[in-house]
Amino acid sequence: MKIGVFVPIGNNGWLISTTAPQYMPTFELNKAIVQKAEHYHFDFALSMIKLRGFGGKTEFWDHNLESFTLMAGLAAVTSRIQIYATAATLTLPPAIVARMASTIDSISGGRFGVNLVTGWQKPEYDQMGLWPGDEYFSRRYEYLTEYVQVLRDLWGTGKSDFKGDYFTMNDCRVSPQPSAPMKVICAGQSDAGMAFSAKYADFNFCFGKGVNTPAAFAPTAARMKEAADKTGRDVGSYVLFMVIADETDEAARAKWERYKDGADDEALSWLTEQSQKDTRSGADTNVRQMADPTSAVNINMGTLVGSYASVARMLDEVAAVPGAEGVLLTFDDFLTGVETFGERIQPLMQCRAHIPAITKEVA
């Protein structure tokens, strides 16, 4: 099973809480995290894109770096780990993304890929005059289909004459082309999103579900496999989890309870309000799960809380789910979390038994 780190491009990572670690996103922080991840043989690092935050006492995600420029910098200071940036496709023409991706491919030596997102939070785009209207919710994957076709043309042949409803290319050129096949990833959980990933993505991200229920996402992975089978392609699921680990189950649980007690209700209210704006998509979209009050303090990603041995066991359960090819991990404290994962959790995982024993990173 592949292991990736979802780097904290926004302030405070993925905990909407006054009692969680409070920090700003910086290049130096993310460099330290990704270099540690590479040292411990993580397979990939991904950054999201967020253009407006949730506010509240913690000013959650009000402070964000930009994904492509961050990952270009990280590509230059790493040598093995795969690097993915996220394109907010309403803000960037596909020909520009194709050229930026080709540039980072050159920086990284063929280790770069692109995560495509359609956009769900209207204020991110409306503040720049780029929101196309609420009808976009129901046609966003039509838009993304044209977008990825332009990308594939330009990366594959260096030229595009694509003509569609949203994009018109007139002998558009991009050169040099990438040195390695450019992987495209997506995070669709709606039927339309999965159909898109089945046809165009190399793999699909999905949310884990619940607290210490590592296999609860299995129906989502099964839906993705069913959609991919219809296209004759192999598109695996990579599952998002937060790891909160400590020496004992009790110590880890105490941290989790403390984070929940400090939930930033004002920021969470913003998330709930924005999630209700999309009345066109189905109930199975990512944003619906993010705003569920069950575990909104960490956006309802699957959460693994326990001792190092308990977390290792639960991750092995994830690996056993049909269609699960990898996990994307967040941590309550990223620097400590990546290190303890590499030294205390990964060596106990049967699905990572092929990874050699790794000594502590030398500063």
UniProtKB/Swiss-Prot annotation:
Keyword annotations from UniProtKB, A to Z: Flavoprotein, FMN, Monooxygenase, NADP, Oxidoreductase
Pfam family, one: Bac_luciferase
Gene: rutA
Catalytic activity, reaction form: uracil + FMNH2 + NADH + O2 = (Z)-3-ureidoacrylate + FMN + NAD(+) + H2O + H(+); thymine + FMNH2 + NADH + O2 = (Z)-2-methylureidoacrylate + FMN + NAD(+) + H2O + H(+)
CDD domains, per database record: Alkanesulfonate_monoxygenase
Leader sequence segment: none
Alphabetized HAMAP family for the sequence: RutA
Enzyme class: oxidoreductase
Similarity-based family: Belongs to the NtaA/SnaA/DszA monooxygenase family. RutA subfamily.
Chain positions recorded as FMN binding sites: 49-50, 115, 124, 140-141, 190
The name this protein goes by in its record: Pyrimidine monooxygenase RutA
Alphabetized Gene3D superfamilies for the sequence: Luciferase-like domain (3.20.20.30)
Organism from which the protein derives: Enterobacter cloacae subsp. cloacae (strain ATCC 13047 / DSM 30054 / NBRC 13535 / NCTC 10005 / WDCM 00083 / NCDC 279-56)
Keyword check for Cell division: no
Gene Ontology process terms (BP): alkanesulfonate catabolic process; nitrogen utilization; uracil catabolic process
GO molecular function list: alkanesulfonate monooxygenase activity; uracil oxygenase activity
The protein's role, per its UniProt record: The FMN-N(5)-oxide reacts spontaneously with NADH to produce FMN. Requires the flavin reductase RutF to regenerate FMN in vivo.
EC number: 1.14.99.46
Record bears the keyword Oxidoreductase: yes
